[in-house]
C-alpha cells in the first residue's frame, strides 16, 4: 500500500510512503557536523606570569619564603598600610576614650565629630594645642575641652585625623561650591590658587590619586609650616646642683671677681 496510518491522538492522520521517502533523501543530503576532538589544542595566546620562580626571590635553605599565589592576589588598600595613619584599633580606642570622657552616646558622638573635624581643618592638629575647641550651635559658640581629644590620640592626633582626610576634602569642596572659601591653614601659607583649597589642611593624606601639582603644594605648605620648628631631644635638666667649691681669693684691687689683673695691669684708680 502507498499509505501509512500515523498513530497519533486520533489515529486518522494518513501519511503517504512518497512523503516519507522524500524526507529521508533530504536528510541524507545534509552533512553531519564533525565531532571536536577533545585532545586537540587551539592556537591560544600565551599568558606570562607577573611573578615567576625564576626571579631572584628570598630563599631559606633552598626553599622560597614567599607564597607567590597569595602575593599575586594580595592588593590591599594602600592607605591602610601607611605608618602615618593610626591603625583601625588605635582609632577605635581613641573614639571610645573620647566618648567615655565626654559621657556621650554614639549618636551624640556623630554630632561632635563633625564640628571637631571642621575645627581641625581651620586650626590644625599640632600636638601643642590645648585649651578648648569650639563648635557653633546656630550663632552660639559651644566650648569643649581639648584634653580628651589629644590625650587619647595614639600615636598622635594628626595620625588619628588622617582617617578624616577624605571627608575633610569633600567638606571643603562643598563649601567652595557655595561660595569663596579657603581654610585658615591655606590662608597662613598664602595659598593663592582657590582650586587647591581642598588640600589646604594639615592632616590631608597624600595618596596615589593626588595630582603632581597638588602634591607639590602640600609639600611646600608643610615645609613652610615647619621651617622655624626646632625639636630638642633633651630639655633643661632642673635637677642640677653646684657641688664644686670656689677657693679663689680676691681682693678689692682685682679687675673683677674672676680676674686678678688685666694682662698685668691693675684695676683703674
From Swiss-Prot:
One Gene Ontology term, aspect cellular component: viral capsid
Listed Basic and acidic residues bias regions: 9-36
Span list, region Disordered: 1-45
Protein name (record): Genome polyprotein
Family of this protein: Belongs to the potyviridae genome polyprotein family.
Keywords: Capsid protein, Virion
The keyword NAD belongs to this UniProt entry's keyword annotation: no
Organism name: Passionfruit woodiness virus (strain Tip Blight) (PWV)
Matches recorded under InterPro entries: Poty_coat
Alphabetized Pfam families for the sequence: Poty_coat
UniProt key word Metal-binding: no
Amino acid at each position: 500500500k502507498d499509505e501509512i496510518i500515523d498513530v497519533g491522538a486520533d489515529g486518522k492522520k494518513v501519511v503517504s510512503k512518497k512523503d516519507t521517502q522524500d524526507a529521508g533523501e533530504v536528510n541524507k543530503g545534509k552533512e553531519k557536523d564533525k565531532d571536536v576532538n577533545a585532545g586537540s589544542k587551539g592556537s591560544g595566546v600565551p599568558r606570562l606570569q607577573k611573578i615567576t620562580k625564576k626571579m631572584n626571590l628570598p630563599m631559606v635553605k633552598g626553599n622560597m619564603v614567599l607564597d607567590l599565589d597569595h602575593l599575586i592576589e594580595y592588593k590591599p588598600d594602600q592607605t591602610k598600610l601607611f605608618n602615618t595613619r593610626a591603625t583601625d584599633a588605635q582609632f577605635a580606642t581613641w573614639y571610645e576614650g573620647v566618648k567615655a570622657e565626654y559621657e556621650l552616646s554614639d549618636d551624640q558622638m556623630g554630632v561632635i565629630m563633625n564640628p571637631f573635624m571642621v575645627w581641625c581643618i581651620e586650626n590644625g592638629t599640632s600636638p601643642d594645642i590645648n585649651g578648648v575647641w569650639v563648635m557653633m550651635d546656630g550663632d552660639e559658640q559651644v566650648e569643649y575641652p581639648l584634653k580628651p581629644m589629644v590625650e587619647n590620640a595614639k600615636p598622635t592626633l594628626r595620625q588619628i585625623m588622617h582617617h578624616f582626610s577624605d571627608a575633610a576634602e569633600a567638606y571643603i569642596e562643598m563649601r567652595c561650591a557655595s561660595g569663596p572659601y579657603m581654610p585658615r591653614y591655606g590662608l597662613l601659607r598664602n595659598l593663592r590658587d582657590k582650586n587647591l583649597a581642598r588640600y589646604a589642611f594639615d592632616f590631608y593624606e597624600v595618596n596615589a590619586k593626588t595630582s603632581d601639582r597638588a602634591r607639590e603644594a602640600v609639600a611646600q605648605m608643610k615645609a613652610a609650616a615647619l621651617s622655624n620648628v626646632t625639636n630638642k631631644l633633651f630639655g633643661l635638666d632642673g635637677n642640677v646642683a653646684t657641688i664644686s667649691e670656689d677657693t679663689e681669693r680676691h681682693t678689692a684691687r682685682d679687675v673683677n671677681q674672676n680676674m686678678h689683673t688685666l694682662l698685668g695691669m691693675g684695676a683703674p684708680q
